[in-house]
From Swiss-Prot:
This is Cytochrome b. The cytochrome bc1 complex contains 3 respiratory subunits (MT-CYB, CYC1 and UQCRFS1), 2 core proteins (UQCRC1 and UQCRC2) and probably 6 low-molecular weight proteins. Gene3D superfamilies: Cytochrome Bc1 Complex, Chain C. Heme b b566 binds at residues 98, 197. It comes from Emydoidea blandingii.
Amino acid sequence: MSTNLRKTHPLAKIINSSFIDLPSPSNISAWWNFGSLLGACLILQTTTGIFLAMHYSPDISLAFSSVAHITRDVQYGWLIRNMHANGASLFFMCIYLHIGRGLYYGSYLYKETWYTGTTLLLLTMATAFVGYVLPWGQMSFWGATVITNLLSAIPYIGNTLVQWIWGGFSVDNATLTRFFAFHFLLPFAIMGLTMVHLLFLHETGSNNPTGLNSNTDKIPFHPYFSYKDLLGLTLMLALLLTLTLFSPNLLGDPDNFTPANPLSTPPHIKPEWYFLFAYAILRSIPNKLGGVLALMLSILVLFLMPTLHTSKQRTAQFRPLTQILFWSLIANLLVLTWIGGQPVENPFITIGQMASILHFSILLILMPIAGTIENKMLT
């Protein structure tokens, strides 16, 4: 009997065990599609990014005009640039939905997978931040100035640290050059960590909507989930192309069409939409160091999720109290996103402070309490 090359060849068998013969729970829903969509986003962003890097000049006198040159003179440069910019938005949409799925269905109990995933989120946020600086528009420059300046709140070493990151006494040519280097390098670190993320996932296998052990009911990844993922990919690409071709600047900031000017501050400095919730939490605390700590904790709180799980059941599928809290958390994050884009004046300040308190209360206090109450309701 001839052996199947797919199962014996050293390289092919890794691909086979990861994407073809991988035993998968038969009941995983469309919420399990986002992992593959994120992989597709990463490939898309890296590809478009490399093509952009071929024509971009990381120098303050050339950066803005080189981006204009890409969109005007390079063959399909407008498409590559707009797909890269809007691809980032789609990337974060998928990330947030992927994390939401993990929180709802208790996927965080696979600790190693969850921790590598949260680290991936931090790396992606860092990559997006340094990438936003590269076009060297007004919002690029002032965003870089404001966010890097937050590090000056660190006691004793703060100011030195900020100047070390800037490579001078202000955001200047040295800053742009190193940010370009980081923006080019970090996606490859993300790819490496993604491999580790998948390695840990395949140690345990996927979770499923019931949160129960699914070893008794597994089906092969191909053709069932490969085609399901392909459908998700088609829908995502349709959304991306619709956004890119019909309203490419919908999610961007008009200020970024003005070249960076250190002598003129834009009326409202704000980051891209996917950072607005964290920006709102940062602004809701009057103290600089307190704001920075709250900003960091708003993301780092994800590392605490496995520790804070008190329920006997894994998923929120059969836990009404936790469901109410989960959807309140989502609504609250949308409120924070809205507040992050508003000017610093009443009533926005008060709403932002309330929403920030609620954000941490739900995650750190109310959800563990709800889990304990639901355990009592079971007995």
